[in-house]
Amino acid sequence: VAMTVQNFEDMGIKTNLNISQFQINENLERSLEKVGPYESVSFSGHNVSFVMLMMKRAMDIAGGLVGMLITAIAVIIVGPLVKLESPGPLFFSQKRVGKNGRIFKIYKIRSMYQDAEERKKELMAQNEMDGLMFKMKDDPRITKVGKFIRKTSIDELPQFWNVLKGDMSLVGTRPPTVDEFEQYSAYHKKRLCQKPGLTGVWQVSGRSTITDFEEIVQMDVDYIDHWSIWRDIGILFKTVWLVVCGDDGAQ
């Protein structure tokens, strides 16, 4: 092929390469890219420009810095209350799956008793979600202080550190646990083609009423396929509104 293209180039003839024989989805966007030493045709459901990605990262850094300041203040206030009710570490860390399947540690202010992970297996029969997520309205593992910091999303504040580190973005999809990810089908894994977010479409779309995992996946895929910086800004404003006015779905 290279020799043929060069011969046509020498004669001043434009060359077109037919890729329809590969039967690739016509809805995918196509672009020419250089990957290492190779020229390639790239296919993607939604191509995002480098400038837009840099704008998103800049927004993450700015938001992460402000968020860490808020986190420090929150820790000073609620930290002693968490420790008084349930002795143990103030912060909770857990392995989650991020962009392209990369494992990272997510951080939260501890809202459960220390044996929460062990007790989860006992409570799986009471899972209110249909699919690969776990959720209980009256989870007995949550402390009294934990209920408050979950309702106000204070427990999520340490994740601003994950945003600054680059593990997460301010807006994105929910990062699954390792055991959830191991049960994913190929379609579910599309949720991980972007960085997971501190907030996202599901969180601002009545998460207390959405119990079907497949519906959540559809919402996430739609977000990825139609992503824009302006959509992120809209989700951030809606998130702030829900935090200030209260979100009954925060469990």
Features from the language model and the residues they span:
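N-terminal hydrophobic signal-anchor/signal peptide
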Residues: 1-72, 250-251
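Residue-level signature of catalytic and energy-coupling elements of molecular machines
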Residues: 15, 73, 101, 160, ...
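Short, glycine-rich, amphipathic interfacial segments at transmembrane boundaries or analogous
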Residues: 29-32, 92-140, 199-220
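C-terminal terminal-structure detector
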Residues: 47, 137, 186-251
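A hydrophobic, helix-centered structural microdomain
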Residues: 49-119, 234-251
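An acidic site on a long C-lobe helix of protein kinase domains
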Residues: 54-57, 105, 141, 153-156, ...
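Short, well-ordered beta-strand elements within core beta-sheets of diverse protein domains
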Residues: 67, 144-152, 221-225
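A short, structured surface patch at a secondary-structure boundary
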Residues: 132-194, 235-243
